[in-house]
UniProtKB/Swiss-Prot annotation:
UniProt name for this protein: 3-ketoacyl-CoA thiolase
SUPFAM superfamilies for this protein: Thiolase-like (SSF53901)
Disulfide links within the chain: none
Positions of the catalytic residues: 95 (acyl-thioester intermediate), 347 (proton acceptor), 377 (proton acceptor)
GO BP term, pick one: phenylacetate catabolic process
A GO cellular-component term linked to this record: cytoplasm
Organism (species): Stutzerimonas stutzeri (strain A1501) (Pseudomonas stutzeri)
Role according to the record: Catalyzes the final step of fatty acid oxidation in which acetyl-CoA is released and the CoA ester of a fatty acid two carbons shorter is formed.
Reaction(s) catalysed by this chain's protein: an acyl-CoA + acetyl-CoA = a 3-oxoacyl-CoA + CoA
């Protein structure tokens, strides 16, 4: 396809191995250090790109306190080969933070406000718990359902509204682990994981080039034995069908098509369309439906045109209604999350948007796909979607 000089293209993508937040590989690595090592690793394998050309480091992070505070984008950038003359900003759109970071870079490129951006995100949920320092306004319950801030209960609500059974959720959770393990065994994550030093369960320092969150031993029988995690009486959502609490970071190099051409780079993909949407916070997990419909309309496409989809697996009870209403349930095995998802890999909030986008691009490359959608729900009722075309 012919590109406009101001089209925004993805030049490369990398991520850390995903670590368990409780005693995991990253337990002795700080969030900004992890981010810096990832950024340096991605730039090191792209020697044609001069770090001094980076206009801005745009980094998603949700709980911006402790080691994730004081503008972690800048804090991480100062630890890398990127010179002090490049800028840095931290973005929070909760679960959609690093996809918003991507959108911000794309919008800047399209409006001639920069040519080279480093985007991504991090969340070290082992060091900074999701509720640390958070003080929700008690008056929120006058404007939205009281349970809107309790993600597990919103998933229960959405699953109940759409008739999603416990068995269907368990099957979805099992699928995530099996596909992620299969992708690992077949080397499908090799291009996207930047190996990192970390500590194993015995405390020994080693290099990790795989995700320690995947549980290949998962069985449907084992999942069926788990108790409801959020609604003890009649609930269907369990720990086994929820995204894992994980430590990790993801990163992309985003450029104008003209600058990529000037440097002789072959981009992975071009961003065709982007969209956001809001929904009732009580069913926050439904957000990807309107945001994806909006993004496809902006791209002049329908879901039938899309070869592959990455939907963040916040909860099986949330993902299945989204897939149902996007008319993807009967095409799930050929199109959706072919390398598993957040149930197996985890959902480090600030990291996930860029992570699913980059995984999508690799899935498309490995399966000769042309058009793809990355989409995710966002706490308190939002959806975010990006349409990519592989180059």
């Amino acid at each position: 396809m012919s590109l406009n000089p101001r089209d925004a293209v993805i030049v490369d993508f990398g991520r850390t191995p995903m670590g368990r937040s409780k005693g995991g590989m990253h337990r002795n690595t700080r969030a900004e250090t992890m981010s810096a090592q990832l950024i340096d690793g991605l730039l090191a394998r792209n020697p044609k790109i001069d770090p001094a050309e980076v206009e801005d480091v745009i980094w998603g992070c949700v709980n911006q306190t402790l080691e994730q505070g004081w503008n972690i984008a800048r804090m991480a950038s100062l630890l890398t080969r990127i010179p002090h003359t490049s800028a840095g900003q931290t973005v929070s759109r909760l679960c959609g933070s690093s996809m918003s970071a991507l959108h911000t870079a794309v919008q800047a490129i399209q409006t001639n406000n920069g040519d080279v951006f480093v985007i991504g995100g991090v969340e070290h949920m082992g060091h900074v718990s999701m509720m640390h320092g958070v003080d929700p306004n008690p008056q929120l319950s006058l404007h939205a359902a009281k349970a809107s801030g309790m993600m597990g209960l919103t998933a229960e609500m959405l699953g109940k509204m759409h008739g999603i059974t416990r068995e269907a959720q368990d099957q979805f959770g099992y699928r995530s682990h099996q596909l992620a393990w299969k992708a690992t065994q077949e080397g499908k994550f090799k291009d996207e994981i930047i190996p990192m030093e970390g500590h194993d369960e015995n405390g020994f320092l080693k290099v990790f080039d795989y995700d320690e969150t995947i549980r290949p031993e998962t069985t449907l029988e084992g999942l069926a034995e788990l108790k409801p995690a959020f609604n003890p009486k009649g609930g269907t959502v369990t720990a086994g069908t929820s995204s894992q609490i994980t430590d990790g970071a993801s990163c992309m190099i985003v450029m104008s098509a003209q600058r990529a051409k000037d440097l002789g780079l072959q981009p992975m993909a071009v961003v065709r369309a982007m969209a956001l949407a809001g929904v009732d916070p009580a069913i926050m997990g439904y957000g990807p439906v309107p945001s994806t419909q909006k993004a496809l309309k902006r791209a002049g496409l329908t879901m039938d045109d899309i070869s592959h989809v990455e939907l963040n697996e916040a909860f099986a009870a949330q993902a299945l209604p989204v897939l149902k209403d996007l008319k993807l349930l009967d095409k799930m095995e050929e199109k959706v999350n072919l390398h598993g998802g957040a149930i197996a890999l985890g959902h480090p909030f600030g990291c996930s948007g860029a992570r699913i986008s980059g995984t999508l691009l690799n899935v498309m490359k490995q399966n000769n796909g042309t058009l793809g959608v990355a989409t995710m729900c966002i706490g308190l009722g939002q959806g975010i979607s990006t349409v990519f075309e592989r180059l």
